[in-house]
């Protein structure tokens, strides 16, 4: 392998790394825009107490909170939400969405 070939390989690898970095930056920016849009939509949909409750849930169950947020935004976009959701309404919605817990009774003989 000559110096020219080695330089060409280095140049290609550098171009590839730069391309990957730019793609990653674009993906990060897109995620940030989507997150901002979601937060703006939630501010219009939820009352402050309900937003606080959802933020608290996000700390303990991030996947569940993300699902609830997506459902709320979809409901709002489809026009099924006519007014801001209060904390009590959000509690009712969360109760419906949380899967029923299975109770286990252990009987010792």
From Swiss-Prot:
Q: State one molecular function term (GO).
A: DNA binding
Q: Which GO terms describe its cellular component?
A: cytosol
Keyword annotations for this protein, in alphabetical order, are: DNA-binding
Q: Residue ranges of region Disordered? A: 14-35
Tell me the InterPro entries matching this sequence: DNA_bind_arc (IPR022889), PDCD5-like (IPR002836), PDCD5-like_sf (IPR036883)
Q: Where is the composition biased (Low complexity)?
A: 16-25
Q: Tell me the domain of life.
A: Archaea
Looking up NCBIfam families in the UniProt record yields: PRK04239.1
Q: Which family does it belong to?
A: Belongs to the PDCD5 family.
Q: What is this protein called?
A: DNA-binding protein Mpal_0536
Q: Which organism is it from?
A: Methanosphaerula palustris (strain ATCC BAA-1556 / DSM 19958 / E1-9c)
